[in-house]
């Protein structure tokens, strides 16, 4: 899950309450919380019951990739999530984290260890939003059309529509949850055609973008 920042909000004044150092590691983190994350919208993953989708290709796709943990919704504490992003900082190849006086780091490798996912057979470095190739062939393979990006109007089959919704909410949860953007189209195509996806690097990349 990740927040959508609300930047450009009114700056806190000198009359603002003193920093609560049980919640924030510094005054700067407190300011970041009030300026960006306090009113941020938290994007929540959807709980997906694979046993209800056994008549589709979806369970096999997630089981063969060992991604089933990404479909299990856990308890959500909105205040902790917002504090996490306010206190976190990107330090090269890791994220320095601080939550309620507990310090830790997040790396691509720590995400992989937590999710118990095998790494790809070879490094995959291209981020989906940086992919410049034409997506026309991908769209046609998926059953869509280039002129339609709204999930309400794309002429997907029921199976593909379900897979796309799972992908958008649980694997690529950025701001607009009703649009199949070009990066999401590439991700969905790679998922559907069984291409290797470095999901741990992808999650790490999305986390860094949200900080």
Each language-model region and where it sits:
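A structural signal for long, well-ordered, hydrophobic/aromatic- and basic-residue-enriched core segments
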Residues: 2-211
